[in-house]
């Protein structure tokens, strides 16, 4: 016979898990982790005991689903994925270095089949602060804004900019083709199209002004010179990739 968290009896491993699952702190801990992973960046885990959740109402909804379902994770996920707070959470998570690398390569169409140079990509996330399969501790990596510092930000910007400006890559070539076929001509249209193709990005007034100033310096698009027009599109995509809104959302 043993006592665990106030429960005494002939307890086995399953009993211990059941007792832990029914603790109020368990529901909050699990649901806050799920919110942090799928919805929006939270403060780091060590601060959870002293700082409220980013969205207490959302967290309470998830906790209720967990408890009312008999402690089923799938009920929490169903509630979360069908919720308005999940559907409305855009640009609420900072990409990890692995996500920056993978999403960029997917967008530009690199490495669609196995290639000898694939191992060369591995260190890129390390330069941004995430050595794959080698977390700093059993706790894993601190996420959210912890991914960003002066060194990692430069590495992130350079990785994205170098690739989206490469008009020979199939994904970028396709973007240029779409922009051309859509009849994009004015600097304003070029900026809007570039933001759309980089993820329907919403930027602030200051960022928009800077992008427009750059686009207006070269006037309207000249699609008669396809190489120059493509280069111009690539440059604009690279500028978008360097914005605060892209890197922090």
Question: Where are the regions that the model predicts?
Answer:
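Flexible, low-complexity segments enriched for small/polar residues
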Residues: 23, 27, 31-69, 77-249
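Long, well-ordered, tryptophan-enriched scaffold segments
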Residues: 1-13
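N-terminal module-boundary/linker segments of secreted carbohydrate-active enzymes
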Residues: 1-2, 17, 235
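A Trp-anchored, charged/polar loop motif used as the substrate-binding/catalytic surface
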Residues: 12-19, 23
């Amino acid at each position: 016979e043993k006592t665990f968290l106030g429960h005494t009896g002939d307890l086995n491993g399953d009993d211990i898990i059941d007792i832990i699952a029914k603790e109020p702190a368990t529901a909050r801990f699990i649901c806050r982790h799920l919110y942090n992973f799928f919805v929006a960046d939270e403060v780091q885990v060590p601060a959870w005991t002293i700082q409220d959740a980013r969205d207490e109402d959302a967290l309470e909804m998830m906790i209720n689903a967990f408890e009312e379902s008999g402690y089923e994770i799938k009920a929490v996920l169903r509630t979360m994925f069908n919720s308005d707070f999940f559907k409305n959470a855009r640009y609420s998570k900072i990409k990890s270095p692995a996500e920056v690398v993978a999403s960029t390569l997917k967008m530009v169409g690199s490495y669609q089949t196995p290639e000898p140079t694939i191992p060369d990509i591995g260190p890129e996330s390390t330069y941004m602060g995430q050595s794959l399969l080698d977390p700093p501790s059993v706790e894993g990596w601190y996420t959210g804004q912890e991914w960003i510092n002066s060194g990692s930000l430069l590495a992130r910007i350079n990785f994205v900019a170098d690739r989206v400006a490469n008009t020979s890559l199939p994904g970028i070539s396709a973007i240029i083709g779409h922009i051309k076929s859509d009849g994009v001509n004015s600097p304003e249209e070029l900026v809007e199209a570039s933001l759309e193709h980089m993820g329907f990005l919403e930027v602030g007034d200051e960022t928009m002004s800077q992008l427009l100033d750059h686009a207006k310096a070269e006037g309207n698009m000249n699609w008669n010179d396809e190489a120059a027009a493509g280069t111009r599109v690539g440059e604009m995509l690279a500028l978008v990739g360097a914005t605060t809104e892209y890197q922090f959302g």
